[in-house]
Amino acid sequence: MKKKMLCPIVIVIAFLICCIVYFKPLSLSDVAEADNQMKMIYSQFEVENGEAYIDSVNYQDITIDQKNAILSLLDKYTYRRTVGTLFSNGSTSDLGNKTLSIYVYDDDLLINSVFATSSGKVVINEKTYNMEDAERFIEQMIEIMN
């Protein structure tokens, strides 16, 4: 009788451990290293006089000081997998009014891409995740670049 009860209990415990590991916070600092090159595009969606427009700024030439500040900021933020992350294709519908695209290169090879939205969604290498304080993250990144 005890063996019959032990097997389902072990399965439930193993499932709970897998859930904890799967949903644990992941660090944004894993997407870039000091020897990588970075490029960014910041976009803000607005409506003026009834017409929608997108204001975009490209940040192509990132200085060493800016890169160090960016790496430090990336170390402070985390993101989490969702149930849908496993099956996501990198698309997201809830963008908010601000987005930041970060492209990380090793020489000329794109190794990581991050698309953060002010709504709390972040797409990393074509997988969608949730990120707390995403809007603050975007604003701090823009402060570093300006």
Residue ranges and their predicted role:
Residues K4-N146:
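Function-determining sites in protein domains
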